[in-house]
Amino acid sequence: MSNTATSVLNAFLTEIERLKIKTILDSEINGIKKIENKYQVLVNGKKMLFDKIIISIGSKAGLKENNNYELLNSLGIKMTPILPALCPLVLNGDFFNKWSGIRVEARVSIYENDRFLKSDLGEVQLTDYGISGICVMNLSSLASKALYQKKKVKVHLNFLPNIEKENIDKWLTLRDNTLYQRTVIELLESIIPYKLLYILVSKAGIKSNCHYKSLTWEEKNDLINNLSDLTLEVRDTKEIFKSQVVTGGIPISRVKDTLEDKEYKGLYYTGEILDVDGICGGFNLGFAWLSSIVVSEDIC
């Protein structure tokens, strides 16, 4: 296996040539119009008639400009809002320059108006604007939709995901008794990166040279909250051209099982133009291929 996109492309081109399928490349589609039982497509200013059309125009993800969605306006087809998905989250805070560049294992939970939506576990990349990483991107479409609806979105970061919150005090006390005369930071430095740990301890109002047994209950509680439930408000997602995919598009309720439009016979959709998005790991590419197979089997 060459594992290159060029090899896949060449395989398709070879099969297209074998089947003697006519292709018109490097052409701009200026408009689509329904005329009786056919579709009139304006190609490079020239009108062409087709029995069936497959809309497979991708999305705005990764692109600064993509006006292909306007092609469907002339048919009066409405789409759900096109929003970033599989993208980093921009958070509210004044200390992100201090944690920028840190990678840490954590559980990320997302809340909408203080209502839990979903969580994911993995490596979180801490940045100067907020957070990124696969587990963050897997939750980003939920944040996009909630922010679009003007709802308050928060993330809860758990840097001790393998310990129940109610057991952290007991666990820290045991470490403090076992690792004699260690400061709070020294107790945790082998588990959480020092730079991040210093921020979490400072935010709890604790001096870096303090020992855990000397802390007040309030200080311990604040520290435990920062370690296992650091709560930050999501201000925005990164721009759509920096996202890997989008959420939104043609509603699934608008299409048949064959992905043909319920209103316009002979009009089909494949891939990301449909309001379908998945998590990282090839699911979005897989849907693009599978939807193409479904459509091709129906039109042939």
Predicted regions and their residues:
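An anion/pyrophosphate-binding glycine-rich loop and adjacent beta-alpha core
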Residues: 78-81, 90-214
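Glycine-rich nucleotide phosphate-binding loop and flanking beta-alpha elements
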Residues: 31, 60-63, 133, 143, ...
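A conserved FAD-binding loop/helix module that cradles the flavin
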Residues: 58-71, 75, 275-300
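A glycine-rich dinucleotide-binding beta-alpha-beta segment and adjacent secondary-structure elements
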Residues: 25, 198-277
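Feature captures the FAD/FMN-dependent oxidoreductase FAD-binding
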Residues: 1-52, 197, 201
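Glycine-rich loop(s) and the adjacent beta-strand/alpha-helix scaffold that form part
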Residues: 52-96
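Short hydrophobic core segments
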Residues: 29, 48-63, 71-73, 124-129, ...
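Flavin (FAD/FMN) cofactor-binding core of flavoprotein oxidoreductases
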Residues: 1-9, 83-94, 237-254
